[in-house]
Amino acid sequence: MISSNDFRTGTSIELDGSVWRVVEFLHVKPGKGSAFVRTKLKAVQSGNVVEKTFRAGEMLPQALLEKSTLQHTYMESGDYVFMDMSSYEETRLTAQQIGDSRKYLKEGMEVNVVSWNGNPLEVELPNSVVLEITETDPGVKGDTATGGTKPAILETGAQVMVPLFLSVGEKIKVDTRNDSYLGREN
């Protein structure tokens, strides 16, 4: 059980038979009446977002999520196949379960797969990944004086804003949490 006072962004709770993740929260203490916690919750399975208000100190069941490190091995008929490298057991996830993570997912990458009651729910990527630029405008000499950026398409299909001096074929490090360029990689 977890108190509504202990909610933080990313906290997972069980509500109405499914897992919900706290996206936003705000502790409100009105001048008259008791305090409450206003939250924005996202259903992990379906992706639905709802706003819900809880009394301050209200106890809710915390979702017991299991994380396991699996390797993305291949795609088959729209499903992403992951393998546990110690037991060689395969786990299949749909494109909906992968969500926005698929724009950085490539074969051979190790990720955390989050499960609830033995059912895989979602994929957690590393905070940063190294990917190759496959398409971008060429950099023109003298463009760097302003320190501008240009769009680049990476090997997984993701689009990221990169500095003007980068060209096709270079490997860059990208932050998967906010889709930002972190630097060149050798």
Swiss-Prot record:
One of its GO terms (cellular component) is cytoplasm. Keywords: Cytoplasm, Elongation factor, Protein biosynthesis. It comes from the Bacteria. Involved in peptide bond synthesis. Stimulates efficient translation and peptide-bond synthesis on native or reconstituted 70S ribosomes in vitro. Probably functions indirectly by altering the affinity of the ribosome for aminoacyl-tRNA, thus increasing their reactivity as acceptors for peptidyl transferase. PANTHER family: ELONGATION FACTOR P (PTHR30053), ELONGATION FACTOR P (EF-P) FAMILY PROTEIN (PTHR30053:SF12). Belongs to the elongation factor P family. This is Elongation factor P.
